[in-house]
Amino acid sequence: MATPLLLVVNAILIMAITACGGGGGNGGIQLIMVNNCGESVWPGLLGTAGHPTPQSGGFHLGAGEEAALEVPAGWSGRVWPRRGCSFDSRGRGSCATGDCGGVLRCNGAAGATPATVVEMTLGTSASAMHFYDVSLVDGFNAPVSMAAVGGGVGCGTAACGADVNVCCPSALEVRDREGRVAGCRSACRAMGGDRYCCTGDYASPSACRPTIFSHLFKAICPRAYSYAYDDATSLNRCHAKRYLITFCPPQPS
């Protein structure tokens, strides 16, 4: 987790970017990614619904580092943390969680589950509202949050700030080579079936209700999607030019 000094440095960086008007030009939206984890994270990125994938789909973000990128207005996509990665000079390797085919730059490939996912559909000049959330529908592998920089109109924070791995049921655990819990699968990913995945006869909000596992995820991370139809308390709406995505966000004291 972050040290007090690191949090101060991050705050100064964000204020400087905001004051100087960096990013968000030409109608684009700036995404600032901050790694407050005590180890490296390799963010994975994927444009959805035909939208481009920025940064060729992935990059390395060391402990305490920040990166800023711009996506166009109307962009739709997802961001997720990859952890426990090792890549050679050609960008080939693997990650313990969130892997996208054994490459550094995912280039249009989605991440393997379990992974905590930030999802967003950004507005345009014709429809300015942005929608975003943090989802555990694909499971959990790291705490993540997304919030507008400097606030905004009707903005909230999407987050799963707790370490779900600590209390992951054994049936959902994914362990690394050292035997440590590296991720927590969703019930859909672990057990399958229409009831857990909200598919087939359960493919509607009225038919697909939260399971005991969804209730557990929601109790730990009340501001994140715990299952497919968890919109009421998980989907955020905002109109801002810059957003901060934080891996391992600081916990309230």
Swiss-Prot record:
S-adenosyl-L-methionine keyword on record: no
Keywords: Disulfide bond, Signal
Pfam families: Thaumatin
Signal sequence region: 1-19
InterPro entries: Osmotin/thaumatin-like_sf (IPR037176), Thaumatin (IPR001938), Thaumatin_CS (IPR017949)
S-S bonds: 37-248, 85-95, 100-106, 155-238, 160-221, 168-184, 188-197, 198-208
Gene3D superfamilies attached to this UniProt entry: Thaumatin (2.60.110.10)
Alphabetical list of SMART domains matching this protein: THN (SM00205)
Record GO biological process: defense response
SUPFAM superfamilies xref list: Osmotin, thaumatin-like protein
Classification via PANTHER family: OS03G0233200 PROTEIN (PTHR31048)
Protein family (similarity comment): Belongs to the thaumatin family.
Official protein name in the record: Thaumatin-like protein
Species: Oryza sativa subsp. japonica (Rice)
